[in-house]
């Protein structure tokens, strides 16, 4: 059964639609690398800080990348986009099982819910810099 766990960022777990803003998306296809840049609303972090905090997320060994506008995602019946925090790691999901079967890879399944979009990634690893 799938499990959802909030990712602990350098300023703690993030909650709320206004917690993460996404300003830049870059996919390097040949390197299987996805880079996301934007700002975090520090007041919505578990370890609250004043103002907005810039972030960079680098996902490596990306085998799955899906980005959907938030309001559209909330109207889809096949996904539970409303659960969890603003940045979650999901385990025991059908996506992970499919990738393991098709490519023999044991990856991470991550979901980032920003103000405007939801980004879902199946990757080997990631690094967050604040």
Language model: regions and residue ranges:
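Surface-exposed, interaction-prone regions used to assemble/regulate multi-protein complexes
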Residues: 1-130
């Amino acid at each position: 059964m799938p499990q959802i766990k909030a990712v602990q960022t350098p300023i703690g777990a993030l909650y709320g639609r206004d917690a993460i803003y996404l300003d830049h998306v870059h996919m390097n296809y040949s390197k299987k690398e996805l880079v996301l840049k934007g700002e975090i609303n520090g007041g919505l972090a578990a370890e609250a800080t004043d103002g907005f905090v810039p972030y960079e997320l680098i996902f490596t060994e990306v085998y799955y990348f899906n980005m959907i506008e938030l309001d559209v995602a909330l109207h889809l019946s096949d996904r539970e986009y409303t659960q969890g925090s603003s940045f979650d790691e999901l385990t025991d999901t059908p996506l992970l099982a499919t990738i393991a079967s098709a490519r023999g890879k044991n990856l991470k399944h991550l979901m980032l819910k920003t103000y405007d979009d939801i980004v879902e990634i199946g990757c080997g690893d990631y690094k967050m810099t604040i």
